[in-house]
Structures are given as structure tokens and as C-alpha cells.
Amino acid sequence: MTNIRKTHPLMKIINSSLIDLPTPPNISSLWNFGSLLGACLAIQIITGLFLAMHYTADTTTAFSSVTHICRDVNYGWAIRYLHANGASTFFLCLFIHVGRGLYYGSFALLETWNIGIMLLLSVMATAFMGYVLPWGQMSFWGATVITNLLSAIPYVGIDLVEWIWGGFSVGKPTLTRFFALHFILPFIISALTMIHLLFLHETGSNNPLGVSSNSDKIPFHPYYTTKDSLGFLLLILLLMTLTLFYPDLLGDPDNYTPANPLNTPPHIKPEWYFLFAYAILRSIPNKLGGVMALILSILILAIIPLLQPIKQQTMMFRPLSQFLFWILVADLLTLTWIGGQPVEDPFINIGQMASILYFSLVIFIMPMICLIENKMLKW
């Protein structure tokens, strides 16, 4: 009798995606982060659902409702901090996942890469709106500053900002719509994830050597399910350590003060995972220029397949590209550090230099080195 997982219409899809999926035998632990992102998404949806049961999206009671969750709801503090720190682990896995895609040339799988960029933008939008919900000082002023950037768009900018706000400033309508969008977006992200996987399974995974593995593949289960389970354990260890020992390590103390439109915090900054983009935004003195640089800093990923004419789908045998990749990583870490510093010398100059280096590396230097390496390899 044929196994039910191979005949049942629904089980067949799960079987071909997670059990009998032909997988390259040599993919490293860096390929674990896709499944870890799935785990992070599941954690965020479950904890978020329980938080939504007790949260009220109203400017007068939002802050109090979060306090109520932490003090009065059974394990409310754990759910709240798992959700907040879960976002940080989500972005950590996301950045490593994108970095692995760049290092091992996964951007050559165009459909998968483009859906991945859509996923990245959706997760960033969700995280931004989630940060507004506790209605603390940094929530309110972060929402004001970031939404206000749209006013830089010529002609329609101011109307667009007021349309998003639902009034003439960030207030109750803004909070209500942000909560509605924050609730629905993770389910859209789940749908996009399935499309992402669908396109990935059309072409098959890349591997560290960048060569075709069609001649030698192994089933996903039990080999990679076992390997991924170690990743899950380490992820849970990190998340639990953050939640139980250092719950406020990555948060902002200002967010424990209720939102006050009459009192601006001395230094408005987003969560750590947006600091690199925030540093790029601040390093350009012109408002419209800053907004364009901010958007381009993420959307530049979409043009990488056009910029880098790789003949080998990996950097493993291209030492010059490897060197530049790690300079890019160091540059992004520098931008993250600068984004959290006040707007004064020497941070302004360092931020400007790091921003110039970021765009130069991705648009000019790395593609040039790529061409040189192709020539050296006689390709």
C-alpha cells in the first residue's frame, strides 16, 4: 500500500517540500536560517495573537494595556518580551539569510530573490508598526519622524502624510490603523513565504561550491530536519536568554514613558535593526535625498543580479570578492553603531563616509572586481 504522505493531496505538498525534497548534500549551517526564519515567524504570530487579546488600540489606554499585560495577565511579561525580543532574533536571522544569499550568489535565482526582497520590506514595515503600538515616547516620536519622511515627496507629500496619520498629527486613527496592519501583515508574510519556497523548489537550492548538485542529492528528512533542529535549539537558547535575563537590553528606556506630544526625547532612534538605514538617512543633509538614500539602501538588493555578472554562483573561489563582502559587513555594522549615536561630530562624518562606502561597494567596486575575476578565470 502506498504511503499516505505520497498520495493525499495536502500531505503530498508537505512531503515534497519538507520530507522527500531532494537537497544538495553539502549545504552548510548558513542554510539553516531559512527554517529559523519560519520558526521566528511562528513564534511572532503565536505571541502576537495572545498580546492582541489583551491590547487596546486607543491612545488613552494603549500604554496602560501593555502594563496590564505585563503585570496582571498570566505570563503576560513572558509573552510580551518573547514578542519584542523575537523581533530582534527575526531580524538577526534575516540579515544572516540575506548575507548568505549575497555571499553564495543566491541572487541568481531571480524569482526567489525578488520575493525575498518583498518579504524583507514586509517584515520591516510590520516591525515599524509594532514598535508604535506600546505608545511610549519613542513609539510616538518614531512614528512621527518616520511617517513625516513621506512629506519629502513633491506635490503629494503632505497630503499623503495626513492621509496615513488620519488627521493633522499622529493620534488615535494612526494607532488604530497601525494595529490593524500590524495584525494582518504577518499572515501576508506567511503567504509570501510559501511563494518564496515554491520558487526555491522550482530551481532547487544553491550550495557552497556553486556547482550543480543534480547528480548527487539527498532527502531533506532525516538529514536536514536533524541539522535544523540544532539551529532551533540555539535560536530558542538565544531568545530565552534575552527574554529571561536581559529583556530590555535591545529596547529603549524612553519607551517606558507614556507618549507626550509636548515633550521631544533628546535622541529619537528606531530599534537596532533599522539603525543602518537610519544612519544613511541622517548622513544626507537634504530631506528628499535622505529619503531616497534610505529607500535605495534596501531596494539596492533588487539590482544586485544586474550589477554582478557572476559566472560562479559562489564567492568561495573569489578571494577579492570575499574581501569586499566582509568590508561591506563591517561597513553595515559601523552604520548600525552610528545610527544609535547623537547627531554631532565625529559621528556625522563617520556616517557620511560609511554611507558613501556602502553605495560605492555595492554599485561600483564589487561589480568591477566581479568582472576582473571573471577575466582572471578566463570566463
From Swiss-Prot:
Its main location: mitochondrion. Its cofactor is heme b. Keywords: Electron transport, Heme, Iron, Membrane, Metal-binding, Mitochondrion, Mitochondrion inner membrane, Respiratory chain, Transmembrane, Transmembrane helix, Transport, Ubiquinone. Disulfide bonds: none annotated. InterPro entries: Cyt_b/b6_C, Cyt_b/b6_C_sf, Cyt_b/b6_N, Cytb/b6-like_sf, Cytochrome_b, Cytochrome_b_C_euk/bac, Cytochrome_b_N_euk/bac, Di-haem_cyt_TM. It is found in: Mitochondrion inner membrane. Coiled coil: none annotated. The keyword 4Fe-4S does not apply. GO terms for cellular component: mitochondrial inner membrane; respiratory chain complex III. One of its GO terms (biological process) is mitochondrial electron transport, ubiquinol to cytochrome c. GO terms for molecular function: metal ion binding; ubiquinol-cytochrome-c reductase activity. A ubiquinone binds at residue 201. The chain crosses the membrane at residues 33-53, 77-98, 113-133, 178-198, 226-246, 288-308, 320-340, 347-367. CDD domains: cytochrome_b_C (cd00290), Cytochrome_b_N (cd00284). It comes from the Eukaryota. It is a multi-pass membrane protein. The keyword Metal-binding applies. Heme b b562 binds at residues 83, 182. Heme b b566 binds at residues 97, 196. Binds 2 heme b groups non-covalently. Signal peptide: none annotated. Heme 1 (or BL or b562) is low-potential and absorbs at about 562 nm, and heme 2 (or BH or b566) is high-potential and absorbs at about 566 nm. Belongs to the cytochrome b family. The cytochrome bc1 complex contains 11 subunits: 3 respiratory subunits (MT-CYB, CYC1 and UQCRFS1), 2 core proteins (UQCRC1 and UQCRC2) and 6 low-molecular weight proteins (UQCRH/QCR6, UQCRB/QCR7, UQCRQ/QCR8, UQCR10/QCR9, UQCR11/QCR10 and a cleavage product of UQCRFS1). This cytochrome bc1 complex then forms a dimer. Component of the ubiquinol-cytochrome c reductase complex (complex III or cytochrome b-c1 complex) that is part of the mitochondrial respiratory chain. The b-c1 complex mediates electron transfer from ubiquinol to cytochrome c. Contributes to the generation of a proton gradient across the mitochondrial membrane that is then used for ATP synthesis. This is Cytochrome b. It comes from Lepilemur leucopus (White-footed sportive lemur).
